Amino acid sequence: MTIPAVDAAPDAPHPVGDDLWWRSAVIYQVYVRSFADANGDGTGDLAGVRERLPYLAELGVDAIWFNPWYPSPLADGGYDVSDYRDIHPAFGTLRDAELLIADALRLGIRTIVDIVPNHVSSEHPWFREALAAGPGSPERERFWFHPGKGPGGDGMPTGWVSNFQGETWTRTTNPDGTPGEWYLHLFTPEQPDLNWNHPDVRREHEDILRFWFDRGVAGVRIDSAGLLIKDPTLPEVPERPAPGQHPTEDRDEVHEVYRTWRRIADSYDGARVLVGEVWVPDPKRFADYLRPDEMHTAFNFDFMSRAWDASELRASIDLMLDAHAPVGAPSTWVLSNHDVTRPVTRYGREDSTFAFAKKRFGTPTDLELGTRRARAAALLTAALPGSLYLYQGDELGLPEVELPREVLQDPMHFRSEGVDPGRDGCRVPIPWRGTQAPFGFSPDDASAGTWLPQPADWADRTVEAQEADPGSMLRLYREALRIRRAEPALGDGHLRWLDAPPGVLAFARGDVVNVTNLSDAPADLPPHDDVLLASAPLAGDRLPPDSTAWLRVRPEPSRSRPEAP
């Protein structure tokens, strides 16, 4: 399929020369497999993304973050990379990626690619060479191969637990058929961990950064950023490890990696941004990744994981703003991503917090309640200081889909012995138009069904249907992002908390005031000049439960007057 180049947008949100764009940016996450399918094989592709770039421009985003689009056996949705310098054949070609990067930039939309430095695919040439070379070989030094414990080496080197549950070591077989060494994988056996003490590993990733920066990407999102460095003595995990002393997480030595990467990023004209996936609960140690010579930003997962509760959310906002302030980095705000339960579903549950360990089939959900809260949360997060991440489909109010077990593909499901439904439910292909599957995700003459099935009742959730509905989630997001771009007080900066009744969050950003009512009763709005936007219809000057309003509150003229002569 030939796709014409996209015309430049006259009102692109951030000029190409703006090196601080990332401090206020709205960044849209594209999970390529599920965004848009141009060739009709049931799997999303880069040509499909190119076709939909005008949609993203109209939505008002500043950048696209792509989940891994590299060649991969897809044992973990593409986070098992076998070649960092090419594109998965199901998604297109390297030339397709280059055209997409260029077309997006003409619309004022930058590109961020995913880097997975902790591990590679078990099909990566390095790992295949290591298996063939045998124990003690230089090839194996790039990974964590280790003899087992006990008679015959039958015991795993450690009892570390996988991030996907289960064991972290898999035993190899020697060329003569006898049991061999064990190798480490903090995720699945198909994702062997790299040894970041080896110079080859560091040089390779530095070259990978340059490869993509040279092709015009504006930044990289760094997967599992705190896991790269391991304690070479392989101790067991203490019950309460001291800061920096966990054998596989948040070790102090990891910061030298990111200082090197920052030097590479800063060597390019125009900002090249490092964005970290940093699951570190201690705010001070989290902020260490954001020192001026390391990453530019990192995901704020604390806010996303909190309950729909005013005191909880205010505590998280204060916690993260206070953590970022000493290092001068902007916070990032996100309600979901490709790993977590969608907000429409999460906020409609009795327990509205998020934790991987709590995911179960059949959790009761009130989608009407969840949708109201997700609309309110959309405005709340867009009003907070810093940058905003938006996962594809959240702007449509898509719920988590409880898929039949026989179609599930996520390793989190299988490694939990079927208890955890996994992450496939938030990765269902996007509905674009029409009244039945595939809802415009694939062409009408598609040769295959979508790689994950779409619910039959999604006709009113399509882009087409929501564009025609002034009260839709999509129209709310478009207006919120339009206002956010137009208002100098929004984006990067500071907030000032205002007095509010219990269950209500109110803060000022310049002359824009955000009021979010998380209580179960209407709340009085403060005196204001205009209502810029509301997530639900207002009853006079009262804000309904589970809703947010943005108000214009101009400063009152000074009451003091010079005395008459």
Feature annotation, model-predicted:
Residues 1-530, 535-565:
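Active-site and adjacent substrate-binding regions of carbohydrate-active enzymes
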